[in-house]
């Protein structure tokens, strides 16, 4: 009846319409996800009337229907894509729960005395937030698919979280009194970049709601926005291209694309487990303290466990851990220092030793049970990176502790018991390596201790950790190269392994860029904030670029220009100068020609 050409055009039109409809639904999902976050921020951030609550609830109901009927339409329009997704069964459960919410709405739905309404309210928020996170995480993969540079995707994701956090902190229910946008932006940047520098008192400025926002910003910034969103995207979507996986592989510094999802899962799992155990230990240490000192001990423990493991340095106490009644709790200081070390040592190192322990324990179990099974033998379970990090970390901790003790024994450590001197010295060697907590008055330290702290801040933590700085591996490679230059040796060999020249070039680039930024930022701050001394400004800038959070009582003196410079420095320190510049500068293709060599006098 119809010609072949007509049927072809008709089928082509149907495919185009179906594709356009599915694309429109996805756009609606993204808009609904953003609307969910906005409505939740409005409901929890403002004191709204009953009429306002009714409008908010109606808005949530509309969003529920968009997600529900949009998902149903997608299933009918493109069933293959749905059933191929890894997390399709979770989405089906969520759809069923959304249908339950829709069907259980009653005329008394807006009554605050209705238990069903309260249940619906909580369930609605949890479900909508869960779905919104899934769909917004998909945007990360979409960005990679559209050939946006992975470095810039990393940068944009941090910018988005920082701006979102700033607006959330400005909500009326998030703070007491007035809070300017620049102060909110500075605090949000400090939290997301896990720095800890503050221009306002966290304890007195922010309400519990505001401190919860800070906690979430620290957590997201600590594990990395890309880590979190990539895990969600890879969990629920299978349509990730080779380029997507290569981009994630480079961001995570993985040797194989097969390990991407496992690395993401282990990172999140390790973070949750360590922080949960740490929170319980911290609660146990403070359980007998007066409620007037710490009203909510559980929240204190959770907040400081997350802040310590993420190397953020934020505290809910005025004066940080130097607060009266807390400064003498040496057990608490040691446990917080342990969390800082675990967070700053790097996830690959934790995984490396986890693999070693698993290997040893399982082989021991097989021997004890008489089994002939054995774990496959690995030549080097503990790789070179792990050996460098562990060695450098031990040297910095032991050396830093001894030098601080020697320098401050007759100053800030005077009058303390032996265990107090040891605890304070150890903590003061740990915290400059990007944590930012303080158990002493930094302004009372001797100049020699300031410069020791400055050096520890600049070196920082280890690669792929929650800490900042130029990293322990970078300084190790640079020092090894200096030694080789003095000895006239070309090859860089560490722990019986030869390092590629790319490692050496990158290490020197990181060091040079760090010094250039510190020098430039110090000059700019000195120009705009002339009230500060050179030592204060240099200390502040180094603390910001290394995402530490220690200050010689200078942060509160910053004016608007100074806050912007330090905020930018914190941001650059978190995303990395190499990462930022690699994303901004166009890459040059390799050339097939070679110039003649000529020595230059150095």
Summary of predicted features, one role per range:
Residues 1-602:
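Membrane-proximal intracellular helices of multi-pass ion channels
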């Amino acid at each position: 009846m119809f010609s072949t050409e007509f049927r072809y055009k008709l089928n082509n039109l149907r495919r185009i319409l179906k594709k356009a409809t599915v694309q429109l639904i996805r756009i609606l999902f993204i808009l609904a996800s953003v609307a969910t976050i906005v409505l939740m921020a409005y409901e929890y951030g403002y004191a709204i009337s009953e009429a306002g609550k009714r409008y908010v609830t109606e808005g949530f109901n509309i969003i529920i229907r968009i997600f529900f009927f949009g998902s149903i339409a997608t299933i009918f329009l493109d069933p293959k894509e749905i059933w191929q997704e890894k997390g399709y069964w979770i989405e089906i459960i969520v759809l069923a729960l959304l249908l339950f919410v829709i069907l259980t709405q009653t005329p008394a739905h807006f009554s605050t005395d209705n238990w069903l309404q309260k249940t619906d309210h909580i369930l609605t928020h949890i479900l909508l937030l869960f779905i919104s996170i899934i769909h917004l995480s998909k945007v990360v993969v979409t960005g990679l698919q559209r050939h946006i540079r992975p470095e810039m995707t990393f940068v944009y994701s941090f910018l988005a979280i920082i701006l979102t956090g700033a607006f959330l902190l400005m909500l009326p229910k998030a703070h007491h009194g007035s809070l300017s946008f620049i102060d909110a932006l500075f605090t949000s940047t400090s939290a997301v970049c896990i720095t800890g520098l503050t221009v306002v008192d966290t304890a007195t400025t922010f309400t519990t709601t505001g401190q919860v926002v800070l906690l979430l910003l620290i957590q997201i910034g600590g594990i990395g926005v890309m880590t979190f969103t990539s895990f969600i995207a890879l969990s629920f979507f299978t349509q990730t291209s080779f380029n997507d996986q290569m981009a994630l592989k480079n961001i995570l510094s993985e040797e194989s694309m097969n390990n991407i999802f496992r690395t993401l899962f282990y990172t999140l799992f390790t973070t949750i487990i360590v922080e949960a155990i740490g929170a319980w230990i911290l609660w146990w240490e403070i359980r007998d303290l007066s409620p007037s000192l710490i009203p909510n001990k559980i929240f204190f423990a959770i907040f400081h466990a997350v802040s310590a493991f993420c190397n953020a340095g934020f505290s809910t106490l005025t004066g940080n851990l130097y607060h009266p009644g807390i400064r003498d709790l040496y057990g608490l200081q040691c446990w917080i220092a342990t969390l800082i070390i675990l967070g700053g040592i790097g996830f690959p190192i934790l995984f490396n030793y986890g693999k070693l322990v698993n290997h040893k324990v399982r082989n021991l179990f097989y021997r004890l049970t008489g089994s002939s099974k054995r774990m496959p033998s690995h030549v080097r379970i503990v790789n070179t990176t792990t050996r460098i990090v562990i060695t450098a970390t031990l040297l910095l901790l032991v050396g830093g502790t001894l030098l601080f003790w020697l320098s401050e024994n007759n100053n800030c450590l005077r009058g303390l018991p032996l265990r107090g001197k040891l605890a304070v010295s150890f903590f003061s060697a740990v915290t400059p390596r990007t944590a930012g907590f303080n158990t002493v008055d930094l302004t009372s330290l001797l100049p020699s201790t300031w410069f020791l702290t400055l050096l520890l801040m600049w070196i920082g933590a280890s690669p792929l950790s929650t800490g900042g700085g130029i990293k322990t591996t970078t300084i190790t490679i640079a020092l090894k190269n200096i030694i080789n230059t003095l000895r006239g040796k070309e090859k860089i060999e560490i722990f019986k392994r030869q390092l590629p020249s790319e490692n050496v070039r990158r290490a020197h680039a990181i060091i040079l860029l760090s010094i250039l930024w510190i020098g430039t930022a110090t000059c700019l701050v000195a120009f705009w904030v002339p009230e500060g001394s050179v030592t204060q400004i240099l200390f502040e800038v180094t603390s910001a670029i290394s995402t530490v959070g220690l200050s010689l009582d200078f942060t509160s003196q910053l004016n608007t220009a100074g806050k912007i410079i330090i905020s930018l420095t914190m941001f650059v320190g978190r995303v990395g100068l190499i990462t930022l510049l690699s994303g901004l500068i166009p890459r040059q293709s390799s050339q097939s020609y070679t110039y003649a060599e000529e020595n230059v006098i150095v």
